[in-house]
Amino acid sequence: YMNNLTYIYKFYNGKSCHIFEISNDYNEIQTLKPEHEFHNFSAIWSKYIDLSESSKNDLPPDEENVYITSPPNYESGYSLSRYYTLPAFNRNYKTTSMFSQSDNCAPTAAVNLCYYWYSRNPEKYASLKQDPRWTNVHDDFYNLMNTHDGSGTSDFSIASAYEDYFNQVGLSCKATLHFTTDFGQKIVDELDNSRPVHLILHDNRTYGEHSVLALGYYQFEYNGSGNSTYIRIADGFSESPNRYVWGGCAGYWNYVTVIPK
């Protein structure tokens, strides 16, 4: 990148090189080799916006009912990879279908966050659990978040619900709503503090509008072209936390940090 333009070099069989010059409006592309002409500019650009053909096997699935369970299947040519999960994360989590209400993904994610802290330190966080099935905890969050059948939960109602619930059971926490995640990097930063994250997916092709609990990550670093980040989640549909969401997927993410005191 220089002079307000991006230059892409593509090598063919180690013998020839095509140089593409892309202007910063993302709509114009031209080769610097006059014998090669491209007319479908947007199609060419879309090939490179996804971290390039040379650095990935296939793009991660980004469609309905297709789940990511093995991020390395979609990455190659990286210089470094990092894998991390929270301590004591691997257990069976609650799903939305375990509770009677509908459009209840945010309360379910909140139950799973409380369940995580309770399981990690049952002495300190004993009061987070009210009943064996966590039904009362779910119902409390459903009400505290002003969740409604048909419309779900507003992002703006989640943080205050955590603080209210922790206070209600004799504990305290600092909960904060954050906007966007820098392709998942901000979730990585928070997980590195050894805390789960309430992750809110918007316009996601697999999950639509959905809340999940972030428990770990897989991150691949490419020299000169940034990172590709996958967040490991308890998604509220499967009890096992073995699915991931990709930081480069369609839509956008907000998130709530919850710091017990």
Where are these regions (language model features)?
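Exposed beta-strand-loop-beta-strand "reactive/processing" segments of non-cytosolic proteins
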Residues: Y1-I22
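Active-site-adjacent structural segments surrounding the nucleophilic cysteine of cysteine proteases
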Residues: N4, D25-S151
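Tryptophan-centered motif/residue detector
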Residues: Y7-Y9, W117, F237
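Ser/Thr- (and often Asn-) enriched beta-sheet segments in non-cytosolic proteins
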Residues: I8, S16, S172-T176, Q219, ...
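Active-site signature of cysteine proteases
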Residues: G14, S23-K33, G184-K186, D192-N193, ...
